């Protein structure tokens, strides 16, 4: 997985070169400057749901699982998530390994009213400006692919643009980095980067390392209402659920089951 992460980052660098040929950073900033910048941070507020805050993911494929679904009506999937009571939607925009697209995010943002997370491998401020233009309410910042200076810069930029940020971690060292840069939302990826195994106990053990005022998100490996209940009992605030929902034939019923037990 660590080698895969390097490959994804390398491909993201190639994507950025092409993106900047089509639209420079200055042109992108100019377009964003025409947007209204609200600082009400709807994504962060959505995760404060006192019941169960579910971030439902729109994901066609992944490096570990390959193609997850062939019938990929992303707009209908997003609408189904919203109707079921999802707190927010995560949209993969990485095209090579996850078969995501910026178009998916833009079009979903035009069709739903709940906040959207741009889930990608952000390594350049360009991608944060781009997320704002596409209609995202939040971005994912992955500690393991950024140095602390980049992480702080990107976190501050996101907030300046009215975007929330999930700062994604995998271990105690990364948790400390996230808290040191002032992350308000910390995510824990339960997938082991070395061997692909998934264990929600990772979230539970790391939750104890941060204060209760930090919004804590568990990512990967959440499959049942029992998983959700166990995490909730351990003061986890939100649950990012992708593959389990994408493979479900009745996404609405599954979300209702996860939310209501």
Predicted regions span which residues?
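An N-cap/entry alpha-helix motif that binds or orients negatively charged groups
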Residues: 3-69
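Conserved, mostly hydrophobic/aromatic
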Residues: 8, 56, 81, 131, ...
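Active-site beta-loop-alpha junctions enriched in small/polar residues
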Residues: 11, 59-61, 94, 121, ...
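N-terminal active-site wall of soluble small-molecule enzyme domains
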Residues: 58, 65-166, 172-177, 203-206
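Catalytic cores of alpha/beta
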Residues: 123-134, 172-181, 218, 222-241
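Glycine-rich phosphate-binding active-site loops on the catalytic face of alpha/beta enzymes
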Residues: 133-150, 187-196, 236-254
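C-terminal helical cap(s) of enzyme catalytic domains, especially alpha/beta-barrels
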Residues: 205-209, 232, 247-261
């Amino acid at each position: 997985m660590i080698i895969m992460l390097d490959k994804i980052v390398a491909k993201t660098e190639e994507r950025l070169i092409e993106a900047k040929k089509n639209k420079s950073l200055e042109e992108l900033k100019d377009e964003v400057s025409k947007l209204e910048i609200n600082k009400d941070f709807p994504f962060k507020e959505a995760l404060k749901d006192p019941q169960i805050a579910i971030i439902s993911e729109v994901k066609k494929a992944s490096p570990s699982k390959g193609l997850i679904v062939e019938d990929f009506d992303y707009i209908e999937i997003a609408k189904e998530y919203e109707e079921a009571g999802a707190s927010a939607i995560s949209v993969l925009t990485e095209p090579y390994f996850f078969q995501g697209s910026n178009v998916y995010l833009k079009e979903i943002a035009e069709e739903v009213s709940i906040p959207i997370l741009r889930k990608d491998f952000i390594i350049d401020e360009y991608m944060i400006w781009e997320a704002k233009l596409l209609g995202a309410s939040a971005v994912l910042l992955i500690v393991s692919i950024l140095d602390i200076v980049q992480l702080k810069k990107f976190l501050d930029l996101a907030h300046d643009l009215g975007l929330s940020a999930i700062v994604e971690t995998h271990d105690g060292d990364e948790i400390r980095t996230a808290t040191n840069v002032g992350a308000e939302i910390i995510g824990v990826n339960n997938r082991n980067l070395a061997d692909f195994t998934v264990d929600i106990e990772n979230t539970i053990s790391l939750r104890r390392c941060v204060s209760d005022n930090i919004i804590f998100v568990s990512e990967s490996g959440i499959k049942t209402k029992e998983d959700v209940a166990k995490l909730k009992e351990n003061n986890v605030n939100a649950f990012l659920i992708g593959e389990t929902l994408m493979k479900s034939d009745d996404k609405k019923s599954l979300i209702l089951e996860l939310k209501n037990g």
